[in-house]
Amino acid sequence: MVVEADKKALICSFCSKKQHEVKKLIAGPAVFICDECIDLCTDIMKEENKVALKQITSSIPTPQKICGILNDYVVGQDQAKKILAVAVYNHYKRLEYVQSGNNDVELNKSNILLIGPTGSGKTLLAQTLAKILDVPFTMADATSLTEAGYVGEDVENILLRLLIASEFNIAKAQKGIIYIDEVDKIARKSENPSITRDVSGEGVQQALLKIMEGTVASVPPQGGRKHPQQDFVQLDTSNILFICGGAFMGIDSIITSRTNHSSIGFAANVNMDKEKNNSEILKSLEIEDLTKFGLIPEFIGRLPIVTTLDELDKEALITILTKPKNAIVKQYQKQFELDDAELVIDDSALETIAEKALAKKTGARGLRSILEHLLLDSMYKVAELKRQRVTITKEVVNGLVEPIMTSLISTKSNKKQPIIADIPA
């Protein structure tokens, strides 16, 4: 409410100027703020936004450096890494360009869609990118989202998580990365528009359109449904990078059907396509395949960069076990080392673990659960016994024998280091 000049003399709660010394006084609950203080606050916020952006853009590594860091954590997926590195680099350079005020050419935001089987590294790629760039990052599960007004999470809750990740620093949050997982689960139930309401499928896609494209969203800082009377935080999503990921189970059949359409009746061609693995089929992905799968054209349009990830083979899984900086075997060996113990996993055991993960079709995600099951009893015992070497062989992985435990003779001056088995050539 605006306080007019004929009212009783009032002062600004911030600068203490009287009402006749300023143009306007805006009243709040027991406080007042003048137009000059409002202008000053606006200038301060603009300056803070510039500083926050400069901190991010000044430290952006080149695409080759981004790819190099990704190689330390993610095995394989070279083409996907290259596409992501270029896309992220261009995104943050775009922010620098927009902030400079040079708007002779309008640069649009390029969100990313990752398509690949379970455990192929989609989530890890997004997490590692955020770590490299040192920007706020949050993950959301698309399966929990519903259209506003229905049981489930509103899409604004995704923005709330980003605000929390940035410690409610709005300027930082507006330059963050949001990863939406399982986006294939919000595909509409049929290719044709439905006359009934699809609140967890097409309805969620429609709700995501605005925030993905760029809008000033009203975010409830305490969650939207339980506290309807709260004040909202205004968050501009124009510069937030959205990365969506999903396995898109069954899309290979859609692609194969399209590519074989012109050769119906020629069984030889169909049989040749059947011999292709999913990774090869996905390389032929077209926009029309995503539409047929159940994504609406408007939603696909908000994700101009689409990249597919390869299915991991046995060699890749063995590498994942031992080579990255945060390799699973290295993590378990460090855990044993903290108990003054040693963990040794031989080559044949690594191969068998990889084969089991392949058989379960869980990709890299299944490796940890297999190792956790194998090492549970050993971790239970070694904390009491200490100074033990635990050896895992192929027979142990296959459940034929128990993990081999032998006593270690170790001293503080000659402490044995964890051993990682060599990967067969």
Curated annotation (Swiss-Prot):
Ligand binding (ATP): 117-124
Entry GO terms, CC: HslUV protease complex
Keywords attached to this entry: ATP-binding, Chaperone, Metal-binding, Nucleotide-binding, Zinc
Binding residue positions for Zn(2+): 12, 15, 34, 37
Any coiled-coil regions, as ranges: none
Gene Ontology biological-process annotations: cell division; proteolysis involved in protein catabolic process
InterPro entries for the chain: AAA+_ATPase, ATP-dep_Clp_protease_ClpX, ATPase_AAA_core, Clp_ATPase_C, Clp_protease_ATP-bd_su_ClpX, ClpX_bact, P-loop_NTPase, Znf_CppX_C4
Molecular-function annotations in GO: ATP binding; ATP hydrolysis activity; ATP-dependent protein folding chaperone; protein dimerization activity; unfolded protein binding; zinc ion binding
Cited Pfam families: AAA_2, ClpB_D2-small, zf-C4_ClpX
All residue ranges annotated as the ClpX-type ZB domain in the record: 1-53
Transmembrane segments: none
Domain of life: Bacteria
Cross-referenced CDD domains: RecA-like_ClpX
Function in brief: ATP-dependent specificity component of the Clp protease. It directs the protease to specific substrates. Can perform chaperone functions in the absence of ClpP.
Family: Belongs to the ClpX chaperone family.
PANTHER family xref list: ATP-DEPENDENT CLP PROTEASE ATP-BINDING SUBUNIT CLPX-LIKE, MITOCHONDRIAL, ATP-DEPENDENT CLP PROTEASE ATP-BINDING SUBUNIT CLPX-LIKE, MITOCHONDRIAL-RELATED
Subunit structure: Component of the ClpX-ClpP complex. Forms a hexameric ring that, in the presence of ATP, binds to fourteen ClpP subunits assembled into a disk-like structure with a central cavity, resembling the structure of eukaryotic proteasomes.
Protein name: ATP-dependent Clp protease ATP-binding subunit ClpX
Species whose genome carries this gene: Rickettsia peacockii (strain Rustic)
